[in-house]
Amino acid sequence: MTRQAFILSDCEFSECGEKPYALLTANPTKEHHYIAQTEQRQHAHNPQVSPQNQNVYKLPLSMFREPAAARRPRSGDKVRGGSESRGAAASVNIIGNLAAKNLYTLTFVENTANQYNLESWFNRHESGYEEACNHLRTLQECRLKTGETDTVKVPDALWRILRLKFLGILRNPHNHKNLFAHRLHEAVRARLPEVGFEFVRLISKRDPSRIEAIMQNYRFSFLGYVDWLAGLYGMLSEGVAQPSLFERLFCTIFAEPDAVKIELFRYAENEGLCLFGDSSFCLQASPKLISVGVNISHDMFAVVHLQTDRWLAFKNTFHHDAPKLEGRVRIIDGDQTQRLMFNQLTISQAHEAVFGRSPNAEDYLEAV
């Protein structure tokens, strides 16, 4: 039987017998988030309201170029959504935040409001995020000792979160010219079998005038956008490869535990807040080590340290298989130096803004 990269269908998953993970179901979703709503809700300043009404604070980068005294709200000042000015925080609704219209559209269904997009394939990785975060908060801190006694086996909850975070780096349109993300995309594109180029054919038929805003806002050329989006479809499709190329890529990153170090930093309610940026990650690199920082919630972030030699080598072999995930993590509570460094890196590597639970810059940049 001819191999299919995807199946376009209006039926439910249970009604479609073969290749359920290659199935794309038509849906009316037009607002496509490149940082998932479930991730953003971990920073909601009004978590007591229904999910569709939850907000986060958007802090433009200009806020952090002002003296501390100028950043502090004056008595009586109010922070409201829709009233953002230069250097001022704004409360923004998560439903429309860090999203773009038709960003991940493969094709439209004629004479209907529906389209085929990455919604269901992303949902596989986004589901269970809140529960995974809650589980990480229950883990016991690793008291620094010697050898392996200061680490614990990576729980499934952390693997789930890290998988979504690495996908977030790749699906974020701000990152298509970022060297780290670009090289990952190139590695995947080089391993796409011929069947995966069916995505290129379909996406390239889209009317350029309908994606003009995407090209302008994220500095894509038309062909650059087509290649980037087709790469996302190709790496996630289990019709192209099973396990998917993305799953193989992710698992291979951690295939040699001795070459990877994972750290989880957590903070109690009175120990300060963590930011997340519109770039989805922050990075530090040296000739010997690459450190990738990802926000998890308002009170947690993780850092994955990769030996540079290993990082350069695995991109040539990841497509062979998806090795079993194994590794250890060090859990550290209340480290203010690391929190401030993470927040500063997040700010310095953001594109337009950072986001969090508080409108005050000092809550992210001062030790508690």
What positions do the PLM features span?
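Alpha-helical structural context detector biased toward long hydrophobic helices
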Residues: 2-368
